[in-house]
């Protein structure tokens, strides 16, 4: 019995030893397997498939402009045409009597006296850009504000830029834009027991992809810059806008000269026929002359300012569009690069996970 017990204990002991030896040998054989020299191909494909999302170049916002305009009064044209025949016919046409009655009713006697006494020298000074004397201006402003008198005056419309009326005293405003560049971390946690060759291959795949992403970003940035340069080169020079205005307003002033001089000559020639209407009609002519020259001065100054404002706004629109496009390029690049960094980490992890035991 004792011998059998010893034999049984020996057998169990030997079996346990064999089992332990087998486990040790198995573990050692796993440890001795070579580590991979390339990352997992599926993860390589995942990295290579990362691309920058398409970036569409946004053009600058359009800057709409309208020119100043001068609309001649139909009633004034009718009256001026009728004045020429009074001296010869000895009669006053209804249109002239109607105009005199409208002015007489709308303008107080004191203002009539002030406006009828305006000299040709004063009118010439205003035509040249000078200020209207204070007393005359006060009387003129009251008269021009009356609808009955307005019917015999030209209508001036100021220019607009970007939907805003330009008066000639517009301060240009700058537009600034900033582009935020997202910081991208390339730090990868070190993974123990990974093959140096496998990591090197993983980094090579990543670096190739990053170079491709960099090239795409450079192309997108260049497209934004090219669009900006094209837009800026298409903006007319301020001088090209302002230079023609000299001739434009010289012609308008010449037309007023002709009208005023002819009207004064006709009224003077018909003074005997006109009687009490003479000073009233002369006042109307002076009102028309002062209003026309001062109005032309105002709209010309406004148009000159509008040229600068339009140029400034177009440049600002081009700059804003460029900055928007560069920002879109940077955002698309940052998104793709972040995905590439995640894929790079997965590649290096695959170098560890494919190979030896833990």
Task: Annotate each predicted stretch with a short phrase.
Residues 2-14, 18, 29-188, 202:
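Acidic/polar, low-complexity intrinsically disordered N-terminal segments immediately downstream
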Residues 10-11, 32, 219, 316, ...:
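Small/flexible residues
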Residues 162-319:
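Extended amphipathic alpha-helical interaction segments
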Residues 307, 312-358:
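C-terminal amphipathic alpha-helix
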């Amino acid at each position: 019995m004792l011998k059998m017990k010893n034999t049984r204990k020996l057998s169990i002991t030997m079996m346990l030893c064999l089992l332990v030896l087998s486990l040790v040998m198995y573990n050692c054989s796993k440890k001795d397997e070579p580590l991979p020299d390339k990352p997992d191909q599926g993860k390589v494909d995942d990295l290579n498939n990362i691309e920058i999302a398409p970036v569409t170049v946004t053009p600058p916002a359009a800057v709409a402009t309208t020119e100043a305009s001068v609309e001649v009064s139909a009633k004034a044209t009718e009256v001026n045409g009728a004045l020429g025949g009074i001296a010869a016919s000895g009669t006053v046409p209804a249109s002239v009597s109607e105009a005199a009655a409208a002015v007489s009713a709308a303008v107080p006697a004191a203002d009539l006296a002030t406006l009828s006494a305006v000299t040709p020298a004063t009118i010439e000074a205003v035509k040249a850009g000078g200020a209207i004397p204070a007393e005359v201006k006060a009387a003129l402003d009251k008269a021009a504000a009356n609808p009955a008198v307005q019917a015999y005056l030209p209508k001036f419309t100021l220019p607009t830029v970007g939907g805003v009326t330009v008066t000639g005293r517009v301060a240009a405003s700058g537009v600034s834009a900033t582009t935020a560049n997202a910081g991208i971390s390339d730090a990868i946690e070190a993974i123990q027991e990974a093959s140096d060759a496998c990591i090197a291959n993983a980094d090579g795949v990543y670096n190739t992809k990053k170079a491709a992403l960099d090239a795409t970003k450079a192309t997108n940035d260049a497209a934004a810059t090219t669009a900006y340069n094209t837009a800026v080169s298409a903006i007319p020079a301020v001088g090209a806008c302002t230079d023609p205005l000299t001739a434009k307003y010289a012609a308008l002033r010449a037309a007023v000269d002709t009208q005023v001089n002819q009207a004064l000559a006709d009224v003077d020639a018909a003074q005997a026929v006109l009687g009490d209407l003479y000073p009233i009609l002369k006042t109307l002519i002076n009102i028309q002359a002062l209003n026309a020259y001062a109005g032309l001065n105002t709209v010309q100054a406004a148009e000159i300012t509008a040229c600068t404002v339009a140029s400034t706004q177009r440049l600002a629109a081009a700059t804003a569009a460029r900055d928007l496009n560069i920002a879109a390029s940077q955002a698309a690049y940052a998104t793709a690069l972040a995905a590439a960094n995640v894929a790079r980490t997965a590649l290096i992890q695959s170098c560890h996970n494919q190979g030896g035991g833990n």
